[in-house]
């Protein structure tokens, strides 16, 4: 699967293209979620509103306080089914509130374990194949 780099909505530097992909989240199939590929992140981080829209109950999930990207947020973990380019996988996602970003983060344990990813910054392209 090949994806072009994209502008990240809500950022001050809209002239930069970033490695971001549209992920279909189980429970909200008609609204693909823009996700930044974050090789430095261990976990997937999504806005908590995504869990609510997907019908995921976080009331019994343990909560952690996390500092990242210049803000502090409360995160609760739950498994989430996701699809990218026809490949579906289930991985843990930390749903965060507040979440001031207009995109989500895909990290090592929730994304990169499942895919072979080649970032081609010179041509603003991401080449992704599922791990077999």
Explain the meaning of each model-derived region.
Residues 1-132:
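Pepsin/retropepsin-fold aspartyl endopeptidases
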């Amino acid at each position: 699967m090949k994806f072009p780099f994209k502008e990240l909505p809500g950022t001050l530097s809209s002239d930069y293209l970033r490695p971001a992909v549209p992920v279909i989240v189980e429970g909200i199939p008609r609204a693909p979620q823009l996700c930044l590929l974050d090789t430095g992140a261990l976990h997937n981080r999504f806005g908590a509103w995504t869990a609510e829209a997907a019908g995921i109950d976080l009331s019994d999930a343990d909560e952690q306080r996390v500092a990242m990207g210049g803000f502090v947020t409360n995160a609760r973990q739950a498994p989430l089914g996701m699809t990218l380019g026809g490949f579906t996988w289930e991985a843990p996602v930390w749903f965060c509130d507040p979440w001031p970003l207009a995109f989500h983060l895909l990290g090592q344990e929730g994304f990169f374990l499942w895919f072979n990813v080649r970032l081609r910054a010179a041509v603003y392209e991401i080449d992704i194949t599922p791990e077999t």
